[in-house]
């Protein structure tokens, strides 16, 4: 009898739908159970219901930025790993504000190459 191990659940968050959907597809093809949402608010709601192992989120989004969403999700799921990515220079100010409040997040620069992301997740 073979015992199946659960795939790590990943939530991808980006207001650029093509990026979120593409990353979710790549992750699903590489042994993860990934889904995508397109707003920070949707990320918090989905995290509450799905309880992902990992969240990969853009920082700059129109309704709730990725750092605000990450802080809210950390309150709900303290053990959830959160990886942020952004191509915006404004991200530094947001990260500094989060650090001042006692929150630390790992950040990757956009564009994120899929192989680099997979290596980071597996490493």
Which functions belong to the PLM regions below?
Residues 17-35, 102-105:
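Two-component/phosphorelay signaling modules centered on CheY-like receiver
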Residues 50-56:
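Active-site beta3 strand of CheY-like receiver
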Residues 1-9, 113-123:
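Non-catalytic signal-transmission and effector/linker regions of two-component phosphorelay proteins
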Residues 14:
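Conserved acidic carboxylate
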Residues 68, 72, 81, 89-109, ...:
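Alpha4 helix (beta4-alpha4-beta5 surface) of REC/receiver domains from two-component response regulators
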Residues 38-42, 65-69:
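Acidic catalytic/metal-coordinating carboxylates
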Residues 61:
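Receiver (REC) domain active-site loop signature in two-component systems and cognate sites
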């Amino acid at each position: 009898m073979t015992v199946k191990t659960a795939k790590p659940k990943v939530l991808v968050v980006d207001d650029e739908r093509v990026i979120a959907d593409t990353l979710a597809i790549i992750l699903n093809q590489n042994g993860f159970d990934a889904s995508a949402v397109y707003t920070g608010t949707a990320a918090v709601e989905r995290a509450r219901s799905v309880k992902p192992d990992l969240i990969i989120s853009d920082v700059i989004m129109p309704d709730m930025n990725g750092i605000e969403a990450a802080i809210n999700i950390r309150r709900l799921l303290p053990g959830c790993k959160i990886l942020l990515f952004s191509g915006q220079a404004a991200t530094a100010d947001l990260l500094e504000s989060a650090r001042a409040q006692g929150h630390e997040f790992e950040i990757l620069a956009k564009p994120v190459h899929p192989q680099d992301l997979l290596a980071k997740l597996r490493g």
